[in-house]
């Protein structure tokens, strides 16, 4: 299944998946209308989310609790490879990562971005709140300045110690 196919599917295209699952996947061309329809306030976060683990799920639930909707900007495969996470990363294709995220109750919408950072994507979404994990210095991120430029805010959420996809991959590879 190609990227456009997965991100462009709608309810009823695949009876094996609930309509709400596929409806959370959003291609960039549909983003403005889909964002407009979301309840406010909108919270936005981004990441690779290669092998989803407890730390990710806790973080996403915390992010959603800060607003009425949570939009996840997902690094495309090309974008993720540029982040230097190691050889063969991401392990899971962007389509699979997007579908896993969309299946989470806390996530309202998932969209891909190809750039190294989601700054351009933020201009489309214009969330009221941008969140990142506590392993980031939120004040130094360009995304923070962008969101604050239209009156939004940015916040770092506590990092859940002991959970890391990179560490998990290293452990598996021995």
Report residues per predicted region.
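Nucleotidyltransferase catalytic core that binds NTPs
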Residues: 10-174
């Amino acid at each position: 299944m190609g990227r456009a196919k997965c991100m462009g599917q709608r309810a009823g295209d695949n009876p094996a998946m609930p309509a709400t699952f596929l409806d959370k996947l959003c291609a960039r061309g549909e983003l403005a209308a889909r964002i407009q329809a979301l309840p406010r306030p909108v919270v936005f976060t981004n990441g690779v989310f290669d092998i989803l683990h407890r730390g990710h799920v806790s973080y996403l639930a915390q992010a959603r609790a800060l607003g009425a909707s949570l939009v996840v900007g997902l690094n495309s495969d090309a974008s993720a490879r540029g982040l230097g996470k190691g050889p063969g990363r991401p392990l899971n294709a962007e389509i699979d990562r997007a579908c896993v995220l969309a299946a989470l109750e806390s996530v309202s919408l998932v969209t891909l971005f190809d750039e190294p950072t989601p700054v351009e994507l933020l201009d489309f979404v214009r969330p009221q709140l941008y969140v990142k994990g506590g392993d980031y210095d939120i004040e130094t991120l360009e995304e923070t300045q962008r969101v604050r430029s239209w009156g939004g805010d940015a916040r770092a959420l506590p990092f859940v110690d002991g959970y890391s996809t990179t560490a998990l991959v290293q452990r598996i590879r021995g």
